[in-house]
From Swiss-Prot:
It is found in: Cell inner membrane. The keyword Cell inner membrane applies. Belongs to the UPF0387 family. It is a single-pass membrane protein. The chain crosses the membrane at residues 6-26. Coiled coil: none annotated. InterPro entries: UPF0387_membrane (IPR020870). This is UPF0387 membrane protein YohO. Its main location: membrane. GO terms for cellular component: plasma membrane. Keywords: Cell inner membrane, Cell membrane, Membrane, Transmembrane, Transmembrane helix.
Length: 35
């Protein structure tokens, strides 16, 4: 459930920021997962 909860929060933040902010957040998250 923890992963699902984080996913929902991440999606909410992505929609909240939107635009360049959302892209930067997504890129940062991708770097964390890749690293």
């Amino acid at each position: 459930m923890r992963i699902a909860k984080i996913g929902v929060i991440a999606l909410f933040l992505f929609m909240a920021f939107g635009g360049i902010g959302g892209v930067m957040l997504a890129g940062y998250t991708f770097i964390l997962r890749a690293g």
